[in-house]
UniProtKB/Swiss-Prot annotation:
The lineage of its organism: Bacteria, Pseudomonadati, Bacteroidota, Flavobacteriia, Flavobacteriales. GO terms for molecular function: ADP binding; ATP binding; proton-transporting ATP synthase activity, rotational mechanism. GO terms for cellular component: plasma membrane; proton-transporting ATP synthase complex. It is a peripheral membrane protein. InterPro entries: ATP_synth_asu-like_sf, ATP_synth_asu_C, ATP_synth_asu_C_sf, ATP_synth_F1_a_nt-bd_dom, ATP_synth_F1_asu, ATPase_a/bsu_AS, ATPase_F1/V1/A1_a/bsu_N, ATPase_F1/V1/A1_a/bsu_N_sf. Belongs to the ATPase alpha/beta chains family. Produces ATP from ADP in the presence of a proton gradient across the membrane. The alpha chain is a regulatory subunit. It comes from Flavobacterium johnsoniae (strain ATCC 17061 / DSM 2064 / JCM 8514 / BCRC 14874 / CCUG 350202 / NBRC 14942 / NCIMB 11054 / UW101). This is ATP synthase subunit alpha. ATP binds at G171, D172, R173, Q174, T175, G176, K177, S178. It is an enzyme of class 7 (translocase). It catalyses: ATP + H2O + 4 H(+)(in) = ADP + phosphate + 5 H(+)(out). The record marks S387 as: Required for activity.
């Protein structure tokens, strides 16, 4: 048996003691005073910051939204089961963030960036992006000059949207607001196939889970999930998750924007986010304002929508952008853009309510969808009179700008005369001509569900309409004429369409279009 040497043992013990480090870490811990309705009041976190994440003893996290004299109000990011009076809550010294990466594309995630589509965890390189972030300053932006093709004829012709713009889609329920935005996402497939993808983020706020599943399935079938991320905070999710879902979507969009690529984000819809924010604010006992919304509901939407912009093309300047997250600094490039299409639901067409007027004043224009037009069969039901794009005109391609120049005015004139014509039948030939042309243009601007048009097809058919080349085609045959006309151009004159796509519109091109229209319209005489 080996002899035990005390000197060796004491040397080993001394070595162990010298290498020992105290594992005690200081944590600031508070106690839950009250919990319920997704809100916890915590006592003892005297140094906690506004917007900081707090972790409860069951692993649940919450965001500090109220700092009061003797306690803090924390909104819970999940169910409150397992948190009770007397539970502990500790500071994390982090703000709410989510991990974003290339492999997030094609997935359905929740507000915290965790996948909820049952396809396993998100792999690849992930970058931490904060939910709340300051919008880029004026120095880091440039004007909107590139078009974002929506594939919707009425929008691309009369209310054009540019990359980096915020264009509000507003209307009553069931007037096709989501459809306009989803068609825009579907239309980006053309750019994805050409190797210049516009990454799309669809944020579903307070919708039924079945509706979101239906949208995801449809995008999958049409091949659009290859460049789309869906962020879902369903109707059954806690109000804080619905409030922060748009911020999560914006953070994902900023990842693409700041790495020099174009992105498009749809917020469907911000009315539900405002309602969820009102619920959270009232539970936190903040004083209510107009329509019981809190005083900072304008700021909620403005700080979200200001994050959509066109970033300056200079990489050197872009790398110094204000409030850049540390994680993405190595991959920052200039020239990216984030285009926002927020949706707002109105009650009985009242655009002058609180939330609609707020968002109208924040955005760069609005597309107003009219229930009466929708019910009369004009779909998309865009009311051209009060729809406007404040910056998109500079982003239209030249050929579209030329053909659609008078279209908006013509249609407004037609609507006015149409109402007048109901009272009298003896109209002069000029008025009759305006009405007949207007009726055909209304038919041209109609479009099927999930059926976006390429820009060259749009320019060709709108040229035919604005030059009154369809005057001999009966109104009920216009859609038939359109299908024949575009099929003829696509099979016989592909080069003409390619020239239109490149923005050219000269006499040789218009001659081809006019001859084709004459030839096809002869069938309908």
């Amino acid at each position: 048996m080996a002899e035990i040497k005390p000197a060796e043992i004491s040397a080993i013990l001394r070595k162990q003691v010298e290498g020992f480090e105290s594992g005690a870490t200081l944590e600031e811990v508070g106690t839950v005073l009250q919990v319920g309705d997704g809100i916890a009041r915590v006592y003892g976190l005297s140094n906690v910051q506004y917007g900081e994440l707090v972790e409860f003893d069951n692993g649940m996290e919450g965001i500090v939204l109220n700092l009061e004299e003797d306690n803090v109000g924390v909104v819970l990011l999940g169910p409150s089961t397992g948190i009770k009076e007397g539970s502990t809550a500790k500071r994390t010294q982090r703000i709410a963030s989510l991990k974003v990466g290339e492999q997030m594309v094609g997935r359905v995630v929740n507000t915290l960036g965790f996948p909820i589509d049952g396809k396993g965890p998100i792999g690849g390189d992930l970058y931490e992006m904060p939910l709340e972030r300051k919008a880029p300053g004026v120095i880091f932006r440039q004007p909107v000059t590139e078009p974002l093709q929506t594939g919707v004829k009425a929008v691309d012709a009369m209310i054009p949207v540019g990359r980096g713009q915020r264009e509000l889609v507003i209307g009553d329920r069931q007037t096709g607001k989501s459809t306009v935005c989803i068609d825009t996402i579907l239309n980006q497939k053309e750019f994805y196939d050409a190797g210049k993808p516009v990454f799309c983020i669809y944020v579903a706020i307070g919708q039924k889970a079945s509706t979101v599943a239906g949208i995801a399935k449809m995008l999958e079938e049409k091949g659009a999930m290859a460049y789309t991320v869906i962020v879902a905070a369903n109707a059954s999710d806690p109000a804080p998750m619905q409030v922060y879902a748009p911020f999560a979507g914006a953070a994902i969009g900023e990842y693409f924007r700041d790495s020099g690529r174009p992105a498009l984000i749809v917020y469907d819809d911000l009315s539900k986010q405002a309602v969820a924010y009102r619920e959270v604010s009232l539970l936190l006992r903040r004083p209510p304002g107009r329509e019981a919304y809190p005083g900072d509901v304008f700021y909620l939407h403005s700080r979200l929508l200001e994050r959509a912009c066109k970033v300056i093309a200079d990489d050197g300047i872009a790398k110094n952008m204000n409030d850049l997250p540390e994680s993405i600094k190595p991959i920052v490039k200039g020239g990216g853009s984030l285009t926002a299409l927020p949706i707002i639901e109105t009650q009985a067409g009242d655009v002058s309510a609180y939330i609609p007027t707020n968002v109208i004043s924040i955005t760069d224009g609005q597309i107003f969808l009219d229930g009466d037009l929708f019910n009369s069969g004009v779909r998309p039901a865009i009311n051209v009179g009060i729809s406007v794009s404040r910056v998109g005109g500079n982003a239209q391609i030249k050929s579209m700008k030329k053909v659609s120049g008078t279209l908006k005015l013509d249609q407004a004139q037609f609507r006015e005369l149409e109402a007048f014509a109901k009272f009298g039948s003896d109209l002069d030939s000029v008025t009759l001509n305006v009405i007949e042309k207007g009726k055909r243009n209304v038919e041209i601007l109609k479009q099927g569900l999930n059926d976006p048009y390429t820009v060259e097809n749009q320019v060709a058919i709108i040229y035919a309409g604005s030059k009154n080349l369809l005057r001999n085609v009966p109104v009920e045959k216009v859609k038939e004429f359109e299908a024949d006309f575009l099929a003829y151009l696509n099979s016989k004159h592909k080069d003409t369409l390619n020239a239109l796509k490149a923005g050219k519109l000269d006499d040789s091109i218009t001659d081809v279009i006019e001859k084709a229209a004459k030839e096809i319209s002869a069938k309908y005489n």
